[in-house]
């Protein structure tokens, strides 16, 4: 399947059309951003690592019964995916306190959250992805009540699957975001799952193994991503 016209260029991925109107090519670039795109740097191998990482995770989620847009890997940095009508709201699950939750509530980082918290954010960089709720979604017509309920159900199911997967690899799944879309009327998991959109800590040391290494200028970003991938069993080379 050959990529054709560039349809969308995000902060770290580019989307291309194909000869099949129902399929797209998703290309992972080496770009890494923070501050809603205010700071961007390039890291060798990052596109490759995130592409293969994402394919691995999406495969695990599909095996658990979660519908995903993933079709197949095409190259080190590209995959073939279903074309979704994306919902403009992202779902976030928090198993431990970190990031904006700590700032917003003034609580200690790392506190376990039981049951996990579920948040919704409007995907809008210019507005810094404001937090919203189901009432906003219904009033502004972003997603139907039924489809939002399905998104929440699938997000919690993904959390159950991924918490165990990462725990078995000696990692804590602190939090993560998921994006969904509609494919022929069905709610389907889209976009990506990688250390760019999740927080992962080492169980023993609590070292951060995700994009917080870039946000907080800790260094060793790609080394951390590759360590996580290899612990999970992702074939990088």
From Swiss-Prot:
Q: Which UniProt keywords apply?
A: ATP-binding, Ligase, Nucleotide-binding, Purine biosynthesis
Domain of life per record: Bacteria
Q: What is this protein called?
A: Phosphoribosylaminoimidazole-succinocarboxamide synthase
A GO CC annotation recorded here is: cytosol
Q: One of this protein's Pfam families, by short name?
A: SAICAR_synt
Pathway this chain belongs to: Purine metabolism; IMP biosynthesis via de novo pathway; 5-amino-1-(5-phospho-D-ribosyl)imidazole-4-carboxamide from 5-amino-1-(5-phospho-D-ribosyl)imidazole-4-carboxylate: step 1/2
Q: Which family does this protein fall into?
A: Belongs to the SAICAR synthetase family.
A GO molecular function annotation here is: ATP binding
Gene Ontology process terms (BP) = 'de novo' IMP biosynthetic process; cobalamin biosynthetic process
**What is the enzyme's main class?**
ligase
* UniProt xrefs under Gene3D superfamilies: ATP-grasp fold, B domain, Phosphorylase Kinase, domain 1
According to its UniProt record, the EC number is 6.3.2.6
Catalytic activity reads: 5-amino-1-(5-phospho-D-ribosyl)imidazole-4-carboxylate + L-aspartate + ATP = (2S)-2-[5-amino-1-(5-phospho-beta-D-ribosyl)imidazole-4-carboxamido]succinate + ADP + phosphate + 2 H(+)
């Amino acid at each position: 399947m050959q990529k054709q016209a560039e349809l969308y260029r995000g902060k770290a991925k580019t989307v291309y059309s194909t000869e099949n109107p129902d399929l797209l090519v998703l290309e992972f670039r080496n770009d890494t951003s923070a501050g809603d795109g205010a700071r961007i740097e390039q890291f060798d191998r990052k596109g490759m690592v995130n592409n293969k990482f994402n394919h691995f995770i999406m495969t695990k989620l599909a095996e658990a019964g979660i519908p995903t847009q993933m079709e197949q890997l095409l190259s080190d940095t590209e995959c073939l995916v279903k074309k979704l009508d994306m919902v403009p709201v992202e779902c976030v699950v928090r198993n431990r306190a970190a990031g904006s939750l700590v700032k917003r509530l003034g609580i200690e980082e790392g506190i376990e959250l039981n049951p996990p918290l579920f948040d919704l954010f409007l995907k809008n960089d210019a507005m810094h992805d404001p937090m919203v709720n189901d009432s906003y979604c219904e009033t502004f017509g972003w997603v139907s009540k039924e489809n939002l309920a399905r998104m929440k159900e699938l997000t919690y199911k993904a959390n159950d699957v991924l918490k165990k997967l990462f725990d078995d690899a000696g990692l804590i799944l602190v939090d993560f975001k998921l994006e969904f879309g509609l494919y022929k009327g069905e709610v389907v998991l889209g976009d990506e799952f990688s250390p760019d959109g999740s927080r992962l800590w080492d169980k023993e040391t609590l070292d951060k193994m995700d994009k917080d290494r870039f946000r907080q200028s800790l260094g060793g970003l790609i080394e951390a991503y590759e360590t996580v991938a290899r612990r999970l069993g992702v074939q990088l080379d």
